[in-house]
């Protein structure tokens, strides 16, 4: 018997535009299943359908059969589905509500009326599995530790089907590899693991099945290596379009310290106009700090950062303008930057003109939202 099975599933949010069409997939126990595809194609929607969030919390028109352990979940309440399907969402901060690791893990177990003895045992098991300590303060955890905590909290409740929505988003390479290795071990122990993820280079060595979501369809990928090569080539080809020779930013001997602790030291490099730059490094090494320095949200303790920005559409920046008007910052959590009630109002809120806002919306494929 499969853990999850979708038969002839169609879904739309408004009854008109279909998000998913004729989905037929089967996910067995004992396997790590990857759901991949471009943003906006319907991966998270698929998660919401399997977990019962659709239609219990999020409205929409759904047809077909969604089977969990061979039983159609149509008409079941969310609480009934959640007893069989655990969900780990992307943003750990939105899921952590307790002060300590112990209390956070215990919270879900208490809601399921576990005995105190069973709760204590579950905490011991998942803390050991996820390399956490009972007494740790949640607010002091790193991004990677928070991700492990919300995964541990889900596992402690005992569901054998676990879905993780982009669990590697806040993890460095080491942390991502460790989490995927743990998920691989859980699958070998009989769990059904479903991972929605973009970081194919990290996840593919750990997964058994790959499902690609595109153009409303969900397709099982047979050749994982070929799939990774095709996706990587697509990214590389896009990067070839960009080149530059003159400097946009110049950093010279830049250092940044907090309470006499060096976060960055003697950073010197140039960023060219028209270029794409990727900052790589382990969690806590200073990547975000460096971005905050470049965007002038922080000022360096030592050294200089100079800029020479020409607007892409021909309006030359003046030195009299404030730095924040020249450098845009997109945060990791979009909830920190969304304020307006509709997509159109959000895009036009700070735009230099409505026409330019419409152009950008079309380029990013969100004009119809």
Residue ranges and their predicted role:
Residues 36-38, 280-282:
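The feature captures the beta-strand-to-loop junction immediately N-terminal to the Walker
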Residues 51, 295:
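Helix-to-loop junction immediately C-terminal to a conserved catalytic motif
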Residues 162-166:
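Catalytic Walker B motif of ABC-type/P-loop ATPase nucleotide-binding domains
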Residues 197-198:
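H-loop/switch region of ABC-family ATPase nucleotide-binding domains
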